[in-house]
């Protein structure tokens, strides 16, 4: 459903589409290879359905995107992975009501997000017994730096979908706009640790936040103040102290 330039489309349809459930972590390498082949075949069946059942017979796999024999991407898109025990654990309550929680995580944010909590459970056998977590809108939120730092491992920074978040809130923090910001913050944290000869958990969160602001990144979702505004960084810094308390919005609310 994702329309791209040059008359191309991204195939990513969760409802009776090309979602495929696999728990790769608990498989052997041989089992993983076989399971991923099944997943590829499932995607190709969906392409066939689009072409022959829905009548989109002019659509096919692009031959100028990936240098692979089957024209599919190098790796599958994983919606969820194993997660660390971080210095902090971000959950749904922190996003819904950031200023009433015991942990003042909004003071340490390094990325923002606003995608609904979205879990694709229908491909899981027995999904009927699971809670309905499909596309529930939530307020826009800030993600704290401590989710990237393992609690019991020195010298390691975690990014992508392995950060310290709850299963439910992973339905929004997993989105690429968020994980791209996580990668930026991880890079800033690593660079500052090396530059200042510090351990990862010794680096000042304010230094990381300043690096992100210098790169025109967001700490908190004050979207009514664009990055081009001369007061943008000031509002972000004041919000990170708790003096300014912004109300997160979502387009569906």
Regions inferred by a protein language model and the residue ranges of each:
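Flavin (FAD/FMN)-binding glycine-rich loop and adjacent Rossmann-like elements that form
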Residues: 1-213
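N-terminal propeptides
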Residues: 210-253
